[in-house]
A protein has these predicted regions:
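Acidic/His- and Gly-rich active-site-bordering loop/insert found
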Residues: 1-29, 49-55, 252
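Residue-level signal for short, function-critical loop segments
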Residues: 5, 65-67, 200-202
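Short, small-residue-enriched loops and turns at beta-alpha junctions
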Residues: 8-9, 68-70, 100, 234-239
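Glycine-rich, phosphate-binding/catalytic loops in enzymes
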Residues: 16-20, 78-80, 110
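Short pre-catalytic strand/loop immediately N-terminal to key active-site residues, enriched for Gly-Thr
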Residues: 23-33, 261-265
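Short glycine-aspartate micro-motif
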Residues: 26, 89-93, 112-114
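Acidic/histidine-rich catalytic neighborhood of metal-dependent amide-processing enzymes
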Residues: 34-108, 171-176
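Metal-dependent amide/peptide-bond hydrolase catalytic core
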Residues: 96-97, 105, 112-279
């Protein structure tokens, strides 16, 4: 049974305190993602205990503290979670769902990528001439446009350049996703950095997409160079027959209790989660 204790709100966010509302609900950082799921996990175990169903059962509760930003290296930060999954027949993630009549059978994995581009710093009067070339900013535009034209439209695959810096001189602080850039309109850009993410439904889809991105990055405009680096984060949790069989049991229980059938939710509408490491 998997949950997490951290939230997406940084220390400098004004949204920091829990507040009880008059209608018996609460609001605060992490109440939806995923304090509510943690409470359901706890009371499900309480109900099983009161019913005497925990005797001779092996149930592992895993509550991580770095789900929103996974600790590195992943091989260490998720080692215990993976080992717990190997000892279990079924793994359930209590991350917030989309209602009582939907469950998540598949989740996309996530990967980071970074493109670093170099051009020749020259006066802009000579741009496109031999020995000057296109500059780093034009090369960044080519790469991003080729990513868009080549990769968009594939089922469950998304990719996003979240931040870009370009000019004569740039500095980028990755932990905070902030940076500075300096350039002049009459100087051909020397440097560009692009930071983005990639979402995929299977490891095969991830590797095929990475190969296409590498090929695009290598096809440079004159007098420019570029390299792309990938960073693994969450693996994909592809749909499996075992997950579909488990859904049938969930749905039958829901119907028996008068709540109607339970259906699978579209994985393209869900983010990555710790349950994927177990799957």
């Amino acid at each position: 049974l998997i949950g997490h204790l951290d939230t997406v709100f940084p220390e400098n966010s004004p949204f920091q305190k829990m507040e009880r509302l008059p209608d018996s609900t609460v609001k605060g950082p992490g109440t939806n993602d995923m304090k509510g799921g943690n409470v359901i996990l706890l009371f499900a175990l309480k109900a099983l205990h009161e019913a005497g169903e925990l005797t001779d059962a092996q149930i592992i509760v895993a509550l991580t503290g770095d789900e929103e930003l996974t600790g590195k290296p992943i091989s260490l930060s998720r080692k215990d979670l993976i080992e717990a999954g190997q000892r279990s027949d079924i793994a359930l993630g209590f991350e917030n769902s989309t209602g009582f009549n939907n469950v998540t059978l598949a989740r996309r994995g996530s990967s980071g990528w970074k493109v670093e581009i170099k051009g020749k710093r020259r006066h802009s009067a000579g741009i496109f001439l031999t020995g000057v070339g296109a500059g780093a900013v034009f090369e960044s535009g080519r790469i991003l446009n080729d990513f868009y034209e080549t990769l968009k439209g594939e089922t469950y695959l998304t990719f996003n350049p979240g931040i870009i810096l370009g000019g004569t001189e740039i500095s980028y602080h990755e932990p905070s996703n902030t940076g500075n850039a300096f350039g002049k309109t009459n100087v051909v850009a020397q440097s560009v950095i692009i930071d983005g993410d990639l979402r995929f439904i299977s490891e095969e889809q991830k590797e095929i997409t990475r190969a296409k991105m590498r090929a695009i990055v290598a096809n440079n405009l004159p007098e420019t160079s570029a390299k792309i680096t990938f960073f693994d984060s969450y693996p994909a949790m592809p749909p499996t027959q075992e997950n579909k069989d488990l859904l049938k049991k969930f749905s039958k229980v829901s119907i028996d209790m008068g709540h109607g059938p339970v259906e699978a939710w579209d994985p393209s509408k869900r983010g990555a989660a710790d349950v994927s490491f177990v799957a």
